[in-house]
Amino acid sequence: MDEFHRCGKEDSFWQQCFLYPLFFQEDLYAISHDHYLDVSSSSRPMEHLSSNDQLSFLTVKRLIGQIRQQNHSIVLFVNCDPNPLADRKKSFYSESVLEALTLVLEVPFSIWSKYSVEGMNECKSFRSIHSIFPFLEDKFPHSNSILDARIPYSIHPEILVRTFRRWIRDAPSLHPLRSVLYDYRNSPENLQRSIIVVPRVNTRFFLFLLNYYVCECESILFSRLKRSSHSRSLSHGSFPQRTHFHRKIKHIIIFSRRNSLKSIWSLKDPKIHYVRYGERPIIAIKGAHLLVKKCRYYLLIFRQFYFHLWSEPYRVCSHQLSKNCSSSPGYFLRVRMNPIFVRTKMLDELFIADLITNEMDPIVPIVPIIGLLATEKFCDISGRPISKLSWTSLTDDDILDRFDQIWRNLFHYYSGSFDRDGLYRIKYILSLSCAKTLACKHKSTIRVVRKELGPELFKKSFSKEREFDSLPFSSKAAARSQRERIWHSDIPQINPLANSWQKIQDLKIENLFDQ
């Protein structure tokens, strides 16, 4: 393992990376054995985790030898069996080898991804979800168009193996990978497909394949986009105001020509900015409409010829930020013109300059959220609240707490939007649905429930937004809450709820794609 880190920066190392001997290290299978037992212990009774699950390293060697001989009768990826005890021994060794394969491939991949993205392409990579919103606020106002793309989730298994061969010359180490991918492709649910669909399950092997596939796409795409991003000529007179001039001057580099007395001022920052959230990358572009069309055409051709995958044109959409909205992550994003007044005083004379700046304006997606609430049976498709019948067996406090948690998550997540009027419509739907649920439980009306239980129960719920206005860092929050926004740092916990409507749209596209 130390050899990987010592030779990580050498380009020739990736072509001489021999991983096959690592498959015969007993420590590797001890780690995979423990991980398999930890995962399976939650789904199997403890009495089944007995001495029958003792790992035999000799059996593992024989299994690897059979894989090396391309014996496809060995099923490495075993799907859900109707009999949980049938072929459990085969599944046990198959999962152990699969876990070991993942561990072996993760070691060079982690080093390769670090140096390929950050070293070769010289790109600043921000891996945290909390850097998305500052990035959007900083880059989107200076762009006029965006490309909303979806990462292709379907790919032929042989293409994945060939991409691994680009940086791993050791062919025997790729036989287990090829066997796993083809066995999964020949499974009943994928038998009618000509391509493999990476399942959206939380298994370590398929998460590794997804991360590798995304990193492979981005590493090649970054280098191409960087070559096509040329510097813009900029004169010194382009700075009418001196606000933050020192910070702007850091982003400028001067080129001098031999046969020219003039210097060319160019921006270091490229015209093209890339951000990815989950499976939805967004490319912000500053340029003419022809440049946007060329980038969109390049993305389609790139997927078609590099990954031998036909990508439908609707999977790469172009939008103008001033006219259209884009969805990411859970918001509808647009850029609006915001005029501001900057006053500068020079030599006892007052000059007033009217400057027009762009500002990102995130909009709460009211219609998709109402559709999500209708799917969860909180209202109908028109937004009329209905009772949540599946919660009528709970206690009153549990019902109020569940409705309260949903509202807190929605308000907490979308507090970064200026226009919050739509949120109060969602609040009305949830509060009335909560009242109807309590009335249905007690077999009465909303008026009777409010009279018997008292209004203090409703005061307890749906009022958490007042706590946000009284935070210590927001002085005079009552007056500032309507014109300032706060990106809260716990959005990973709220994010699945906020993006559920986008998953529904992706499923519709997948169904059209399968047909």
Curated annotation (Swiss-Prot):
One cellular component (GO) term of this entry: chloroplast
Q: Where in the cell does this protein reside?
A: Plastid, Chloroplast
Keywords (A to Z) from UniProt: Chloroplast, mRNA processing, Plastid, RNA-binding, tRNA processing
Q: Which GO terms describe its molecular function?
A: RNA binding
**GO annotations under biological process?**
mRNA processing; RNA splicing; tRNA processing
- Superkingdom of the source? Eukaryota
Per the record, the similarity remark reads: Belongs to the intron maturase 2 family. MatK subfamily.
Q: What is this protein called?
A: Maturase K
The protein's organism comes out as Pinus roxburghii (Chir pine)
